[in-house]
Regions:
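C-terminal segment of classical bacterial N-terminal signal peptides
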Residues: 1-7
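Soluble, non-transmembrane alpha-helical interaction regions
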Residues: 8-114
Length: 114
């Protein structure tokens, strides 16, 4: 998210008033960026919730196992599966954020605010 700081720095360096078209262009770029980030979050949170609910049910079921060795192996597998699911959801969300910021930087340059 380094783009946020560079965009802010660029805004502070500018002098004078901007025309309405430029202001609207930047506002649209902001909307596009933030809506893309929100869509990434809309995908992430249900995936994270499902991963946690799956882990919860699986762990409870594992604790019905009376054999300690089998239970230990099952629990290890459950945690590994949860870790992979949670990581996949986070990676997808971060990827969406990265794409949104790159597109914002490109869109903002097109607006040419000085």
């Amino acid at each position: 998210m380094g783009g946020a700081y560079s965009a802010l720095a660029k805004e502070k360096k500018g002098k004078g008033a901007l025309d309405t078209a430029t202001l609207l262009c930047v506002q649209k770029a902001i909307d596009n960026r933030d809506n893309a980030i929100l869509m990434g979050l809309d995908v992430y949170y249900p995936a994270a919730k499902t991963a946690l609910q799956t882990r919860q049910a699986a762990l409870k079921n594992a604790w019905t196992q009376t054999d300690q060795k089998i239970r230990k192996d099952v629990i290890k597998t459950i945690w590994k599966s949860y870790k992979n699911s949670a990581k996949s959801a986070r990676t997808a969300m971060k990827g969406a954020q990265k794409v949104a910021w790159k597109k914002f930087e490109a869109d903002r340059k097109v607006c040419n605010p000085k």
